[in-house]
């Protein structure tokens, strides 16, 4: 039952995912829209799917592989195109592709999928080529294809929608993709002229994999003598250990040896070193499991003892948009392959488990191990010399029982409401000498998250919208060359180049420190936030604190204020701009905090302050503060200061004679203070209204606070047209016309309701009296009376069919006037006699029913 634990964890995750998602919400501190920061773009009209990126650090050139084209652009400014070459599909191939049921407009094209360095003067390029994958060599000098047209089967996918990955190792291409047209035969292969290898076509080896990443880890100088280089493949596949009604996906890491040459008799031209293990990325305390692998990045840095794998995961049932980042050390991965237990296929009754741990003897040399000095000492100099027993064991047991666990046994980052697609990681040194890992993670909506791994937390520094449209980022590339650090992102529409930091966007020392960006520091000398490692000046005196402590920011700049004049009874809007998503905006007036619950105040966008019904008591100084909590400490900084003065505007009645002589311009000047409700200046001559200037400074207080006045540009114009504020007396005719129209409409509706009878009973009597004189109105029970008459007449009709005479209907008491004249009034005795003469079959069905069945005749019994 131990093997069912991962599955139980997955099902538990599916149950608690909605409950636990709320807790995983690290919000980016800053959000940059597409036009707010300096981004460089490259796009060629008519070309799409920029999914292959390759950097040449020596030449400062970025190679871009797109649909039917390859470009070379300047790595420092990708908008500068250097070279281009097109690789289009012939019409004949397009027609043959369309005959196979594929789209001629979208699928039967040449999508560049492999773009790898072959030598210093050439690139190895492969494309889907209308479902006929083809590879060629691209000469970098002439930037033209050499026309080799090699078969790309097993190196490049047939379908552009199928997964793929590749890496060039020593001039040999290692790739993971599909091997046939349908994509039903997955393969991990090595393209070599002297020793090509591939995986066994068997479900235990690869079961519907989705390839994500591949890279080579060279042997360590401190490792055992004679150790071989290893190539790692990362993918997600359908589980072979468990079987359910749905396909359970499992993330894997597989390893092959560079020196593998296949077996002599068993596993000929097949990998003899292929082993795979499960990757664990889960939160133990919540049971949340992330089992869909999206991307992997290998972090290599001089300060690291060994490479670290950073991987992006999402849950299989990701209906709430959860993503996670887990990190794995190379030693942990190698320990599973070199010392871990194997699994074997078994049938367990009444269980979903299909594979269990193998506890039997393991052959020597160890199956799946690379040829090292120990194997050579035992005369196993090559995989061709390995015994069949070892090779058969590898063929039957490619899956490891032990799993690869992440660092600290938990994800580095869990983020909700986002789907991460790609990741790159940079290791940088802060001002205090500490090294930090900074992750750049792209989303399926074209955004880039930047997060730094601190001692006890992961801080999401910022979110940058790379593309105007919310399109997924297909690939990420990091250039960490000293003095030139950029992130390149490719999507379906183009490529975007972004710097690793936007330090210049932080306008104050507090804001620069609170960003907790290891790339940024505050320079008191130039009073600006600068980028580390890119400034030639000395860093002496720079301020940076990764804990967010702003106590070192002693250089307080002079505080400026905005002065406003408003009329009594109006509404004032005081603006405050705060960029941090982690900060809370607080408004203070006379050392007291203003609350939105008060009917006196309101907030626009949780930042700007609205003051209603201004009075003399509202005059004073209003301060907008930003309170941001960092590591159980609240950091407060002043964002804006407003000096508000409320004045009573005297109303002088205009002279009747002078009012007629006034021009439209004089009216505006005299009524300007009344019309100004959003922050106009006090009443001044008309010349001042046309030439606004800075407000007069108030006298300095005894507290000694240095405040520098700031010119106020009102949010509304100083001059308003009178007709936009008041309704002229000459326009009363418009109001009277409107009222008259409403009255006529009311009369029409009333007349229509009277005609249709859609009125209460009293009104109907009044209507009848007016229209019909003394005629008695029709009773409200006329419908009921008619129903009674029809009920009493119907039996007579049936009796007439049987040859009997029809019986007269009962007297209802509502005969017409002519009927009462031509007939006499019946007595009580006659009425009772007529009722007794009614036969049983003439009575209503619901009075007396002796029928056995509803559709039978009464006389048929």
Curated annotation (Swiss-Prot):
Q: Where is the Ig-like C2-type domain?
A: 555-636
Provide ranges: composition bias, Polar residues.
657-681
For the Extracellular compartment, the record's topological domain ranges are 24-733
Keyword hit for Flavoprotein? no
A GO-annotated cellular component: ciliary basal body
Task: List the keywords (alphabetical).
Answer: Cell membrane, Developmental protein, Differentiation, Disulfide bond, Glycoprotein, Immunoglobulin domain, Membrane, Neurogenesis, Phosphoprotein, Signal, Transmembrane, Transmembrane helix
- Regions of biased composition (Basic and acidic residues) lie at 826-839
Q: List the expressing tissues.
A: Strongly expressed in lymphoid tissues, especially in the thymus, as well as in the nervous tissues. Expressed in neurons and glia in the developing hippocampus.
Tell where it localizes: Cell membrane
Residues recorded as bearing Phosphoserine in the entry: 782, 832
Specify the superkingdom.
Answer: Eukaryota
Signal sequence residues: 1-23
Query: What S-S linkages are listed for this chain?
Result: 97-108, 126-135, 257-370, 281-326, 503-520, 509-553, 512-529, 576-624
Regions of this protein lying in the Cytoplasmic compartment: 755-861
The UniProt entry lists the main location of this chain as membrane
Q: Which PROSITE patterns match?
A: IG_LIKE, SEMA
Topology versus the membrane: Single-pass type I membrane protein
- List the carbohydrate attachment sites: 49, 77, 139, 191, 379, 419, 613, 632
GO molecular function list: receptor ligand activity; semaphorin receptor binding; signaling receptor binding; transmembrane signaling receptor activity
Bilayer-crossing regions: 734-754
Please describe the quaternary structure of this protein.
Answer: Homodimer. Interacts with PLXNB1. Interacts with PLXNB2.
Provide the protein name.
Semaphorin-4D
Q: Which organism is it from?
A: Mus musculus (Mouse)
**Source organism lineage?**
Eukaryota, Metazoa, Chordata, Craniata, Vertebrata
